Regions:
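A solvent-exposed, acidic/Ser-Thr-rich amphipathic alpha-helical stretch
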Residues: 10, 17-69
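A beta-strand edge to alpha-helix "cap/lid" segment located at domain peripheries
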Residues: 45, 49-120
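Short basic coil micro-motifs at the edges of alpha-helical modules that engage polyanionic partners
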Residues: 1, 35-36, 87
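Short, aromatic-enriched amphipathic alpha-helices that serve as compact interaction elements
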Residues: 1-8, 15
Length: 120
C-alpha cells in the first residue's frame, strides 16, 4: 500500500508478476464489467491509471492480517478521497498470492458496493 499512498505508479506495477491479476472487487463491477480481472502488465497498468491514480488519496487500514504459505489475507477498511475532497470508506478483505519470484501473482478484493459509506 505504500506505493499506492505515495502515488508511485512504477513501484506499484513492479510488485506484480508478469502474469499477475488484479480483481478489485471480485466479480463484475464498474471497474471490470465482465468480472474477469485485470490480467497482465498492460491491464494492471490500465487499472492503476483508471482507478488508483484517479483518486486524490487511498489509505488502507489493516485491522487483521493472516499469512499462510504464499498467501496473505488482510481485513480492514479502505478510505478513498476524491479530487475535490469528498471521501468514502468500505470494509473489505484483500487477499494476495505470491509468485515463486516473490511478486504478486494475484490481488483479490472482497468488498460490496452496497457497503460503501460517505465520510468527511
Amino acid at each position: 500500500m505504500d506505493a499506492v499512498e505515495a502515488h508511485d505508479r512504477e513501484a506499484w506495477l513492479a510488485l506484480f508478476a508478469d502474469d499477475g491479476v488484479v480483481e478489485d472487487p471480485i466479480g463484475p463491477s464498474a471497474f471490470d464489467p465482465e468480472g474477469k480481472g485485470h490480467r497482465g502488465p498492460e491491464a494492471i497498468a490500465a487499472f492503476y491509471d483508471n482507478v488508483v491514480a484517479a483518486n486524490e488519496s487511498i489509505k488502507f487500514t489493516i485491522r487483521e492480517s493472516y499469512l499462510c504459505g504464499d498467501e496473505c489475507a488482510n481485513v480492514g477498511v479502505i478510505r478513498i478521497t476524491f479530487a475535490g475532497g469528498s471521501a468514502m470508506e468500505v470494509d473489505g478483505v484483500y487477499t494476495y498470492r505470491r509468485s515463486p519470484d516473490g511478486k504478486i501473482a494475484a490481488l483479490r478484493a472482497y468488498w460490496e458496493a452496497d457497503n460503501i459509506r460517505s465520510v468527511s
